Amino acid sequence: MPTPLRPRLPLMSSDTGFAVRSAAFYAALFMLNGIVLPFFPVWLKAKGVEAALIGIILAAPPVVRIIAIPLITANADRRDAVRGTLIAASALCVAGYALVASVEGGLVILVAYALTSFAITPIMPLLETYTLRGLGARGRAYGPVRLWGSVAFIVGLFGAGFAADVMAARELIWLIVAASAIALVMAVNLAPLSAGDTTPAAPSPAPRRRLLRDRAFLVVAVSAGLTQASHAVYYGFSALDWSKAGLDGTAIAALWALGVIAEIILFAFLNRLPAVLTPELLLIVGGAGAVLRWIVMAFDPPVALLPLLQLLHALSFGMTYLGALFFTHRHAPPGQAATAQGYLAIVLGVTAACATAASGWLYGAFGDKAYAAMALVAIVGCGYGAVAHRAARRVSGDAA
Protein backbone atom coordinates (compact mmCIF):
# COMPACT_ATOMS: atom_id res chain seq x y z
CA MET A 1 0.00 0.00 0.00
CA PRO A 2 1.37 3.46 -0.79
CA THR A 3 2.88 5.25 2.16
CA PRO A 4 0.45 8.25 2.26
CA LEU A 5 -2.52 6.05 3.23
CA ARG A 6 -1.12 4.42 6.34
CA PRO A 7 1.17 6.72 8.38
CA ARG A 8 0.44 8.39 11.69
CA LEU A 9 -1.70 11.50 11.73
CA PRO A 10 0.51 14.55 11.17
CA LEU A 11 -1.36 16.67 13.71
CA MET A 12 -0.77 14.05 16.44
CA SER A 13 3.00 14.23 16.09
CA SER A 14 5.65 16.56 17.45
CA ASP A 15 6.72 17.20 13.84
CA THR A 16 3.72 19.38 13.03
CA GLY A 17 5.33 22.32 11.25
CA PHE A 18 5.24 20.98 7.72
CA ALA A 19 1.76 19.49 8.05
CA VAL A 20 0.20 22.57 9.67
CA ARG A 21 1.68 24.98 7.14
CA SER A 22 0.62 22.78 4.23
CA ALA A 23 -2.90 22.49 5.68
CA ALA A 24 -3.07 26.27 6.03
CA PHE A 25 -2.24 26.75 2.36
CA TYR A 26 -4.80 24.14 1.31
CA ALA A 27 -7.37 25.98 3.45
CA ALA A 28 -6.54 29.38 1.95
CA LEU A 29 -6.57 28.04 -1.60
CA PHE A 30 -9.89 26.23 -1.23
CA MET A 31 -11.49 29.17 0.56
CA LEU A 32 -10.57 31.21 -2.52
CA ASN A 33 -12.19 28.57 -4.73
CA GLY A 34 -15.31 28.61 -2.55
CA ILE A 35 -15.67 32.31 -3.29
CA VAL A 36 -14.69 32.30 -6.96
CA LEU A 37 -16.86 29.43 -8.20
CA PRO A 38 -20.27 30.81 -7.22
CA PHE A 39 -19.62 34.56 -7.05
CA PHE A 40 -17.19 35.45 -9.85
CA PRO A 41 -20.02 34.99 -12.41
CA VAL A 42 -22.24 37.21 -10.22
CA TRP A 43 -19.60 39.93 -10.33
CA LEU A 44 -19.23 39.57 -14.09
CA LYS A 45 -22.96 40.04 -14.54
CA ALA A 46 -22.92 43.10 -12.27
CA LYS A 47 -20.16 44.54 -14.46
CA GLY A 48 -22.53 44.31 -17.41
CA VAL A 49 -20.83 41.39 -19.18
CA GLU A 50 -23.23 39.53 -21.48
CA ALA A 51 -24.13 35.93 -20.64
CA ALA A 52 -22.42 34.50 -23.73
CA LEU A 53 -19.17 36.29 -22.91
CA ILE A 54 -19.41 35.21 -19.25
CA GLY A 55 -19.38 31.62 -20.49
CA ILE A 56 -16.27 32.31 -22.57
CA ILE A 57 -14.53 34.01 -19.63
CA LEU A 58 -15.31 31.07 -17.33
CA ALA A 59 -13.88 28.70 -19.96
CA ALA A 60 -10.48 30.43 -19.76
CA PRO A 61 -8.96 28.28 -16.96
CA PRO A 62 -9.56 24.85 -18.59
CA VAL A 63 -8.20 26.18 -21.89
CA VAL A 64 -5.19 27.97 -20.42
CA ARG A 65 -4.26 25.04 -18.16
CA ILE A 66 -3.38 22.90 -21.20
CA ILE A 67 -0.46 25.25 -21.85
CA ALA A 68 0.29 26.60 -18.39
CA ILE A 69 0.45 23.40 -16.35
CA PRO A 70 3.06 21.45 -18.38
CA LEU A 71 5.25 24.54 -18.81
CA ILE A 72 5.25 25.59 -15.17
CA THR A 73 5.35 22.14 -13.54
CA ALA A 74 8.17 21.00 -15.83
CA ASN A 75 10.12 24.16 -15.00
CA ALA A 76 9.57 23.54 -11.28
CA ASP A 77 10.88 19.99 -11.66
CA ARG A 78 13.83 21.08 -13.77
CA ARG A 79 14.88 23.72 -11.22
CA ASP A 80 13.80 21.60 -8.22
CA ALA A 81 11.86 24.66 -7.04
CA VAL A 82 8.33 23.48 -6.26
CA ARG A 83 7.93 25.72 -3.20
CA GLY A 84 9.41 28.75 -4.94
CA THR A 85 7.15 28.23 -7.93
CA LEU A 86 4.13 27.99 -5.62
CA ILE A 87 5.03 31.33 -4.06
CA ALA A 88 5.59 32.99 -7.44
CA ALA A 89 2.33 31.62 -8.86
CA SER A 90 0.42 32.76 -5.76
CA ALA A 91 1.88 36.27 -6.06
CA LEU A 92 0.91 36.43 -9.73
CA CYS A 93 -2.57 35.22 -8.76
CA VAL A 94 -3.02 38.22 -6.44
CA ALA A 95 -1.74 40.60 -9.10
CA GLY A 96 -3.97 38.97 -11.70
CA TYR A 97 -7.16 39.27 -9.67
CA ALA A 98 -6.29 42.88 -8.81
CA LEU A 99 -5.92 43.52 -12.55
CA VAL A 100 -9.27 41.85 -13.25
CA ALA A 101 -10.86 44.06 -10.60
CA SER A 102 -9.48 47.26 -12.09
CA VAL A 103 -10.21 46.87 -15.81
CA GLU A 104 -13.43 47.64 -17.67
CA GLY A 105 -15.14 45.89 -20.57
CA GLY A 106 -15.90 42.22 -21.08
CA LEU A 107 -13.14 41.54 -23.59
CA VAL A 108 -10.49 43.24 -21.44
CA ILE A 109 -11.69 41.25 -18.42
CA LEU A 110 -11.38 38.08 -20.54
CA VAL A 111 -7.74 38.86 -21.35
CA ALA A 112 -6.94 39.73 -17.72
CA TYR A 113 -8.63 36.59 -16.40
CA ALA A 114 -6.87 34.39 -18.96
CA LEU A 115 -3.52 35.80 -17.79
CA THR A 116 -4.55 35.20 -14.18
CA SER A 117 -5.52 31.63 -15.03
CA PHE A 118 -1.97 31.04 -16.27
CA ALA A 119 -0.83 31.52 -12.66
CA ILE A 120 -3.78 29.82 -10.94
CA THR A 121 -4.08 26.52 -12.78
CA PRO A 122 -0.63 25.05 -11.95
CA ILE A 123 -0.96 25.74 -8.21
CA MET A 124 -2.91 22.60 -7.33
CA PRO A 125 -0.61 20.02 -9.01
CA LEU A 126 2.39 21.85 -7.57
CA LEU A 127 0.86 21.83 -4.08
CA GLU A 128 0.01 18.13 -4.28
CA THR A 129 3.59 17.38 -5.32
CA TYR A 130 5.03 19.52 -2.53
CA THR A 131 2.74 18.05 0.14
CA LEU A 132 3.09 14.39 -0.81
CA ARG A 133 6.86 14.72 -1.07
CA GLY A 134 7.24 16.41 2.31
CA LEU A 135 4.74 14.23 4.16
CA GLY A 136 6.20 11.08 2.64
CA ALA A 137 9.68 12.01 3.84
CA ARG A 138 8.28 12.54 7.33
CA GLY A 139 6.11 9.40 7.36
CA ARG A 140 2.96 11.47 7.79
CA ALA A 141 -0.59 11.09 6.45
CA TYR A 142 -2.01 13.11 3.57
CA GLY A 143 -5.72 12.96 4.46
CA PRO A 144 -5.73 14.98 7.70
CA VAL A 145 -3.83 17.75 5.88
CA ARG A 146 -5.95 17.83 2.74
CA LEU A 147 -9.28 17.78 4.59
CA TRP A 148 -8.74 21.39 5.72
CA GLY A 149 -9.08 22.44 2.11
CA SER A 150 -12.55 20.94 1.95
CA VAL A 151 -13.50 22.52 5.29
CA ALA A 152 -12.33 25.92 4.08
CA PHE A 153 -14.24 25.52 0.82
CA ILE A 154 -17.48 25.31 2.81
CA VAL A 155 -16.42 28.29 4.95
CA GLY A 156 -15.62 30.33 1.85
CA LEU A 157 -18.86 29.34 0.15
CA PHE A 158 -21.14 30.28 3.04
CA GLY A 159 -19.03 33.25 4.18
CA ALA A 160 -19.10 34.80 0.74
CA GLY A 161 -22.82 34.08 0.55
CA PHE A 162 -23.42 36.09 3.70
CA ALA A 163 -21.13 38.86 2.42
CA ALA A 164 -23.00 38.96 -0.88
CA ASP A 165 -26.18 39.75 1.04
CA VAL A 166 -24.69 42.97 2.42
CA MET A 167 -22.23 44.00 -0.33
CA ALA A 168 -22.89 45.42 -3.76
CA ALA A 169 -22.33 42.75 -6.42
CA ARG A 170 -19.73 44.98 -8.12
CA GLU A 171 -17.61 44.85 -4.94
CA LEU A 172 -17.48 41.04 -4.68
CA ILE A 173 -14.25 40.93 -6.67
CA TRP A 174 -12.43 42.44 -3.69
CA LEU A 175 -13.35 39.40 -1.60
CA ILE A 176 -11.56 37.34 -4.24
CA VAL A 177 -8.52 39.64 -4.20
CA ALA A 178 -8.38 39.47 -0.39
CA ALA A 179 -8.69 35.67 -0.37
CA SER A 180 -5.90 35.36 -2.96
CA ALA A 181 -3.71 37.61 -0.79
CA ILE A 182 -4.31 35.30 2.18
CA ALA A 183 -3.30 32.36 -0.02
CA LEU A 184 -0.07 34.19 -0.91
CA VAL A 185 0.74 34.68 2.78
CA MET A 186 0.19 30.97 3.40
CA ALA A 187 2.37 30.10 0.39
CA VAL A 188 5.24 32.21 1.72
CA ASN A 189 4.77 30.47 5.08
CA LEU A 190 5.25 26.99 3.58
CA ALA A 191 8.15 25.09 5.10
CA PRO A 192 11.12 24.66 2.75
CA LEU A 193 11.66 21.13 1.48
CA SER A 194 14.79 19.66 3.01
CA ALA A 195 17.45 17.83 1.02
CA GLY A 196 15.81 14.52 1.93
CA ASP A 197 12.50 15.69 0.51
CA THR A 198 13.74 16.53 -2.96
CA THR A 199 14.25 14.33 -5.98
CA PRO A 200 16.85 14.59 -8.74
CA ALA A 201 15.95 17.01 -11.47
CA ALA A 202 14.98 15.62 -14.85
CA PRO A 203 17.93 15.96 -17.22
CA SER A 204 15.97 16.52 -20.45
CA PRO A 205 12.48 16.64 -21.96
CA ALA A 206 12.82 13.05 -23.19
CA PRO A 207 11.71 11.38 -19.92
CA ARG A 208 8.68 13.68 -19.83
CA ARG A 209 7.69 12.51 -23.29
CA ARG A 210 8.09 8.90 -22.13
CA LEU A 211 5.66 9.60 -19.30
CA LEU A 212 3.03 10.53 -21.88
CA ARG A 213 3.59 7.13 -23.52
CA ASP A 214 3.44 5.23 -20.21
CA ARG A 215 0.42 2.93 -20.58
CA ALA A 216 -0.09 2.44 -16.83
CA PHE A 217 -0.14 6.18 -16.17
CA LEU A 218 -2.46 6.89 -19.09
CA VAL A 219 -4.92 4.16 -18.06
CA VAL A 220 -5.11 5.55 -14.51
CA ALA A 221 -5.45 9.14 -15.76
CA VAL A 222 -8.26 8.20 -18.16
CA SER A 223 -10.02 6.18 -15.46
CA ALA A 224 -9.98 9.09 -13.03
CA GLY A 225 -10.78 11.59 -15.76
CA LEU A 226 -13.90 9.75 -16.90
CA THR A 227 -15.24 9.13 -13.40
CA GLN A 228 -14.64 12.75 -12.40
CA ALA A 229 -16.17 13.96 -15.68
CA SER A 230 -19.32 11.98 -14.91
CA HIS A 231 -20.12 14.67 -12.31
CA ALA A 232 -20.82 17.22 -15.07
CA VAL A 233 -24.62 17.03 -14.99
CA TYR A 234 -24.58 17.13 -11.18
CA TYR A 235 -22.33 20.20 -11.07
CA GLY A 236 -24.26 22.01 -13.77
CA PHE A 237 -27.89 21.14 -13.14
CA SER A 238 -28.48 19.57 -9.71
CA ALA A 239 -29.36 22.93 -8.14
CA LEU A 240 -31.85 23.61 -10.93
CA ASP A 241 -33.37 20.15 -10.52
CA TRP A 242 -33.70 20.45 -6.77
CA SER A 243 -35.18 23.91 -7.08
CA LYS A 244 -37.85 22.51 -9.40
CA ALA A 245 -38.51 19.83 -6.77
CA GLY A 246 -39.39 22.59 -4.30
CA LEU A 247 -36.15 22.92 -2.32
CA ASP A 248 -35.09 26.43 -1.33
CA GLY A 249 -31.60 27.85 -1.62
CA THR A 250 -30.61 26.93 1.93
CA ALA A 251 -31.61 23.29 1.43
CA ILE A 252 -29.73 23.13 -1.87
CA ALA A 253 -26.61 24.62 -0.28
CA ALA A 254 -26.90 22.13 2.58
CA LEU A 255 -27.06 19.21 0.13
CA TRP A 256 -23.96 20.46 -1.66
CA ALA A 257 -22.20 20.95 1.67
CA LEU A 258 -23.14 17.40 2.70
CA GLY A 259 -21.22 16.05 -0.29
CA VAL A 260 -18.13 18.01 0.75
CA ILE A 261 -18.56 16.86 4.37
CA ALA A 262 -18.56 13.24 3.17
CA GLU A 263 -15.29 14.02 1.40
CA ILE A 264 -13.88 15.54 4.61
CA ILE A 265 -14.76 12.41 6.59
CA LEU A 266 -12.96 10.26 4.01
CA PHE A 267 -9.82 12.40 4.29
CA ALA A 268 -10.00 12.34 8.10
CA PHE A 269 -10.04 8.53 8.25
CA LEU A 270 -7.87 7.93 5.20
CA ASN A 271 -5.03 6.34 7.16
CA ARG A 272 -7.47 3.81 8.65
CA LEU A 273 -8.59 2.41 5.32
CA PRO A 274 -7.71 -1.26 4.77
CA ALA A 275 -4.25 -1.74 3.30
CA VAL A 276 -5.78 -3.81 0.50
CA LEU A 277 -7.20 -0.60 -1.00
CA THR A 278 -4.45 0.14 -3.49
CA PRO A 279 -4.71 3.25 -5.71
CA GLU A 280 -6.08 1.08 -8.51
CA LEU A 281 -8.79 -0.37 -6.24
CA LEU A 282 -9.69 3.14 -5.09
CA LEU A 283 -10.40 3.97 -8.73
CA ILE A 284 -12.70 0.95 -9.02
CA VAL A 285 -14.57 1.75 -5.81
CA GLY A 286 -14.87 5.40 -6.79
CA GLY A 287 -16.16 4.52 -10.25
CA ALA A 288 -18.67 2.05 -8.82
CA GLY A 289 -19.91 4.69 -6.39
CA ALA A 290 -20.41 7.11 -9.28
CA VAL A 291 -22.33 4.51 -11.31
CA LEU A 292 -24.70 3.85 -8.40
CA ARG A 293 -25.11 7.56 -7.67
CA TRP A 294 -26.00 8.60 -11.24
CA ILE A 295 -28.27 5.62 -11.95
CA VAL A 296 -30.41 6.51 -8.94
CA MET A 297 -30.36 10.22 -9.85
CA ALA A 298 -31.61 9.36 -13.33
CA PHE A 299 -34.88 8.07 -11.87
CA ASP A 300 -35.90 11.26 -10.03
CA PRO A 301 -35.31 9.98 -6.48
CA PRO A 302 -37.44 11.32 -3.61
CA VAL A 303 -36.03 14.26 -1.68
CA ALA A 304 -35.56 12.07 1.40
CA LEU A 305 -33.03 9.95 -0.52
CA LEU A 306 -30.88 12.88 -1.68
CA PRO A 307 -28.77 13.13 1.52
CA LEU A 308 -27.75 9.48 1.18
CA LEU A 309 -26.85 10.00 -2.47
CA GLN A 310 -24.77 13.03 -1.52
CA LEU A 311 -22.74 10.88 0.87
CA LEU A 312 -21.63 8.88 -2.17
CA HIS A 313 -19.52 11.92 -3.10
CA ALA A 314 -16.88 10.43 -0.80
CA LEU A 315 -16.61 7.56 -3.29
CA SER A 316 -17.38 9.11 -6.67
CA PHE A 317 -15.11 12.11 -6.14
CA GLY A 318 -12.96 11.41 -3.08
CA MET A 319 -11.73 7.89 -3.71
CA THR A 320 -11.31 8.48 -7.42
CA TYR A 321 -9.20 11.57 -6.83
CA LEU A 322 -7.07 9.91 -4.17
CA GLY A 323 -6.48 6.81 -6.29
CA ALA A 324 -5.17 8.87 -9.20
CA LEU A 325 -3.18 11.18 -6.92
CA PHE A 326 -1.39 8.41 -5.02
CA PHE A 327 -0.71 6.35 -8.14
CA THR A 328 0.78 9.34 -9.94
CA HIS A 329 2.94 10.25 -6.94
CA ARG A 330 4.35 6.71 -6.71
CA HIS A 331 4.67 6.17 -10.44
CA ALA A 332 6.35 9.45 -11.44
CA PRO A 333 9.97 9.02 -12.58
CA PRO A 334 12.66 10.77 -10.50
CA GLY A 335 12.58 14.52 -11.00
CA GLN A 336 9.14 14.50 -12.62
CA ALA A 337 6.71 14.49 -9.69
CA ALA A 338 5.27 17.94 -10.46
CA THR A 339 5.24 17.22 -14.19
CA ALA A 340 3.30 13.98 -13.65
CA GLN A 341 0.75 15.68 -11.39
CA GLY A 342 0.45 18.38 -14.03
CA TYR A 343 -0.31 15.86 -16.77
CA LEU A 344 -2.92 14.25 -14.52
CA ALA A 345 -4.52 17.65 -13.90
CA ILE A 346 -4.69 18.27 -17.65
CA VAL A 347 -6.44 14.95 -18.30
CA LEU A 348 -8.93 15.65 -15.51
CA GLY A 349 -9.53 19.14 -16.85
CA VAL A 350 -9.98 18.15 -20.49
CA THR A 351 -12.37 15.30 -19.74
CA ALA A 352 -14.37 17.52 -17.38
CA ALA A 353 -14.54 20.29 -19.98
CA CYS A 354 -15.81 17.89 -22.66
CA ALA A 355 -18.41 16.40 -20.32
CA THR A 356 -19.51 19.86 -19.20
CA ALA A 357 -19.98 20.95 -22.79
CA ALA A 358 -22.07 17.84 -23.51
CA SER A 359 -24.06 18.07 -20.28
CA GLY A 360 -26.01 21.12 -21.38
CA TRP A 361 -27.27 19.40 -24.51
CA LEU A 362 -27.98 16.17 -22.62
CA TYR A 363 -29.95 17.90 -19.90
CA GLY A 364 -31.84 20.03 -22.39
CA ALA A 365 -32.81 16.95 -24.41
CA PHE A 366 -33.41 14.40 -21.67
CA GLY A 367 -33.74 16.22 -18.34
CA ASP A 368 -32.99 13.97 -15.36
CA LYS A 369 -32.24 11.06 -17.69
CA ALA A 370 -28.99 12.84 -18.57
CA TYR A 371 -27.64 11.24 -15.39
CA ALA A 372 -27.92 7.87 -17.15
CA ALA A 373 -25.35 9.07 -19.69
CA MET A 374 -23.10 10.08 -16.80
CA ALA A 375 -23.50 6.58 -15.36
CA LEU A 376 -22.27 5.15 -18.66
CA VAL A 377 -19.23 7.44 -18.52
CA ALA A 378 -18.53 6.26 -14.97
CA ILE A 379 -18.86 2.62 -16.04
CA VAL A 380 -16.11 3.16 -18.60
CA GLY A 381 -14.00 4.94 -15.98
CA CYS A 382 -14.51 2.03 -13.59
CA GLY A 383 -13.52 -0.36 -16.37
CA TYR A 384 -10.25 1.47 -16.92
CA GLY A 385 -9.67 1.23 -13.17
CA ALA A 386 -10.13 -2.54 -13.41
CA VAL A 387 -7.57 -2.65 -16.24
CA ALA A 388 -5.12 -0.72 -14.06
CA HIS A 389 -5.76 -3.05 -11.12
CA ARG A 390 -5.22 -6.16 -13.23
CA ALA A 391 -1.99 -4.74 -14.64
CA ALA A 392 -0.75 -3.86 -11.14
CA ARG A 393 -1.45 -7.39 -9.90
CA ARG A 394 0.37 -8.84 -12.88
CA VAL A 395 3.41 -6.64 -12.21
CA SER A 396 3.29 -7.56 -8.51
CA GLY A 397 3.13 -11.25 -9.40
CA ASP A 398 6.08 -10.94 -11.78
CA ALA A 399 8.10 -9.14 -9.10
CA ALA A 400 7.35 -11.90 -6.60
Identify what each model region corresponds to.
Residues I66-A81, A164-D165, I265-T278, Y363-G364:
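Helix-to-loop junctions at the C-terminal end of transmembrane segments
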Residues Y113-W148:
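Cytoplasmic helix-loop-helix junction between adjacent transmembrane helices
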